[in-house]
Amino acid sequence: MAFEIDGKCLCYHGPLLYEARVLRVYDPASQTYRDRTRTGVPLEEEDGLPAESRGREHWFVHYQGWKSTWDEWVGQERIRPYNDENLALKRQLVQDAKAAAAAAKRAKARPGKRERSPAPAAPAAPAQGPRLAVRMPVELKALLVDDWERITKERKLVALPCAPTVGDILDAYYRERTAQLASPVAQTLLHEFVEGVHLYFDQCLSHLLLYRLERLQFDEACGGAAPAASGLPAPPEPRPSAVYGGVHLLRLLSMMPELICGTTMDEKSCHTVVAQCESLLAWMATHADDLVSGDYINTSAQYEGVALGM
């Protein structure tokens, strides 16, 4: 993708697209970036691009109308050209979010009755692969919208560790679903899918699934421990799937089409994975009250200052 300095673009922030302006362009080959007045600037730790993301092209963007504390690096999974097609997608995502919020209010007003009509949850896939979208039950999409508001507007964080964790959720789904499958082939495909989601989550969480406000919390929760006084090596950092829970799993599943379209999977395999994602989402919708924690904690001014300055 080609995005010029000071050029307009659209970026995903949570479930919606926002207008943004490119301030810097990072080149992974040289490990440098350029901005309006400089080229070949070496990337420093304080520039805020995580080490695990430096092997891919990134853009440092400013969201129009937002404070500069929200300026951040985004990868190709989150940035889109500013054109009529993506502006239409931006409007559609807003309409979907409003519909999800309205459905959630209706569901709360009528306990015991759940909305079952699904709604597209994932952004359009990159042009180089098959165009795919995961259809997410509307009540789960409403949870993602609520999650976005809690973090970006109310400056809250999901309470960690979650119960159940992503690992717990995937294990429970596998046990229940595999008991319903008579075919050994179908059981094997299910096992491969669950293991793949588990692996994707652990690998993608830190650089794709977190809001800027959450990164410091991630470092504290999954950054490992300092060596003990005895000089013994620090214990391995916990897998994110053993710390984070349902709402972060929903974030991953909503992005899955883009992630798999960037791989060498053929189109048939991509559609199979999407179908598996939709089956998992349907199961999560029936157990949403138990699987997706609504526990959020307030952040202090000191935490916000450090987290948003990272």
Swiss-Prot record:
Name all Tudor-knot domain ranges. 8-80
Here the segments flagged for biased composition (Low complexity) are 118-127
* Annotated compartments: Nucleus
One GO term (biological process): DNA repair
Q: Which residues form the MRG domain?
A: 128-308
The record's principal subcellular location, in a coarse class, is nucleus
The record's listing under InterPro entries reads: Chromo-like_dom_sf, MRG, MRG_C_sf, MRG_dom, MSL3_chromo-like
PROSITE patterns reported in the protein's UniProt record: MRG
Keywords from the UniProt entry: Chromatin regulator, DNA damage, DNA repair, Nucleus, Transcription, Transcription regulation
Q: Does the keyword 4Fe-4S apply?
A: no
Q: Main role?
A: Involved in deacetylation of histones, chromatin assembly and chromosome segregation. May act as a transcriptional oscillator, directing histone deacetylases to specific chromosomal domains. Component of the NuA4 histone acetyltransferase complex which is involved in transcriptional activation of selected genes principally by acetylation of nucleosomal histone H4 and H2A. The NuA4 complex is also involved in DNA repair.
Q: What is this protein called?
A: Chromatin modification-related protein EAF3
